[in-house]
């Protein structure tokens, strides 16, 4: 079952946001995105900036499910770690991608 959420604003603003991020992000490293929502931005930016490892997070379990669904849909399971719940002390990023280095 497809559990991806779609937020209309993402379609409109991912290119301008990505253009701005390109001017400030390093070529390599890890980015922690707070309150990632549907996960559409996280996946788009992971694809646009392959030298970075994009770590999505969201306190809403439905959003984390959507983020992980977007990651799977984009075929980024082995590149992007699963979404984190930064409000939970039990979530330690157990995704296999977490141990990869760039």
Placement of each model-derived feature along the sequence:
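Glycine-rich SAM-binding Motif I of class I
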Residues: 39-43
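Conserved class I S-adenosyl-L-methionine
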Residues: 28-37
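Class I SAM-dependent methyltransferase Rossmann-like catalytic core
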Residues: 1-28
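A short acidic, Gly/Pro-enriched loop at the edge of an enzyme's catalytic core
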Residues: 94-102
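Conserved residues at beta->alpha junctions
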Residues: 8, 36, 57-58
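Class I SAM-dependent methyltransferase SAM/SAH-binding core
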Residues: 44-91
């Amino acid at each position: 079952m497809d559990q991806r959420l779609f937020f209309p604003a993402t379609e409109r603003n991912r290119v301008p946001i990505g253009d701005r991020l390109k001017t400030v992000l390093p070529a390599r490293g890890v980015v922690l995105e707070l309150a990632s929502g549907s996960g559409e931005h996280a996946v788009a930016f992971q694809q646009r900036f392959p030298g970075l490892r994009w770590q999505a997070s969201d306190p809403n379990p439905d959003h984390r499910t959507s983020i992980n669904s977007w990651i799977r849909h984009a075929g980024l399971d082995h590149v992007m770690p699963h979404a984190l719940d930064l409000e939970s002390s039990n979530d330690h990023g157990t995704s296999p991608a977490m141990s990869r280095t760039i």
